[in-house]
Amino acid sequence: SYQAVFKIGEEVIESKTVVYGAEVVAPEAPAKEGHTFAGWQDVPATMPAHDIVVMGSYTVNKYTLTYKVDGAEYKSVEVDYGTTITAEPAPEKEGYTFSGWQGLPETMPAKDVEVTGTFSINSYQAVFKIGEEIIESKAVVYGEEVVAPEAPAKEGHTFAGWQNVPATMPAHDIVVMGSYTVNKYTLTYKVDGAEYKSVEVDYGTTITAEPAPEKEGYTFSGWQGLPETMPAKD
């Protein structure tokens, strides 16, 4: 009889004596998590006239790692058991923030794995200014309608409107500028109840009086009721 030793790596799975010429029966390899037994190498059909060492080996199993975003499959990869997992880069979606991957193990287990992520919609800041004055500042959800505020009344001026207001909120903060135009009012000069001259004057402008009219044999009294600057009325 001779010795038949069956090993996997340095581990002896079985060691037994077998009579010369008898059939050599290999043992069943023990189960190993995440691996498949690849078989015994060069097992003789019958026992030779010397001791033998028969080597066996395992192959590493691959398992499926599936990434899902908002319930839909994003990517699927095959990963060897026990491999350290490097997460897929976060997907990008304009106007949204990705939550990160949930359920991602550090190393690949001996089973298929599904990891999930979700997008949440962002809000951005919409600031409405006239000059240096902030009229309104508010958070607006990406893609929602941008509603401009009503501009405050300003004496002697007409609001000219907000410039370049987007229809819907973009994926960034915005500053929207507004402006006023100066109103014109009518300055009417009357002499002895009859209209002498009428001019259009911007609100707030310093008024320079019309030269005194002349009439032979008469003295002009001067202009009464003439303001220093043009008020917000005729």
Provide a role label for each language-model segment:
Residues S1-Y2, F6, P30-A31, P44-Y63, ...:
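Conserved "repeat-terminator" motif of extracellular CCP/Sushi domains
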Residues Y2, Y20-V24, A49-D51, K62, ...:
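Short coil/turn motif common to extracellular beta-sandwich-like domains
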Residues A4-Y20, T66-G82, V127-Y142, T188-G204, ...:
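Short, solvent-exposed loop/edge segments of extracellular or virion-exposed proteins
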Residues G9, E14, V53, T86, ...:
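Residues marking helix boundaries in flexible regions
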Residues E23-M47, T83-M108, E145-M169, T206-A232:
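Surface-exposed interfaces of beta-sheet-rich extracellular modules
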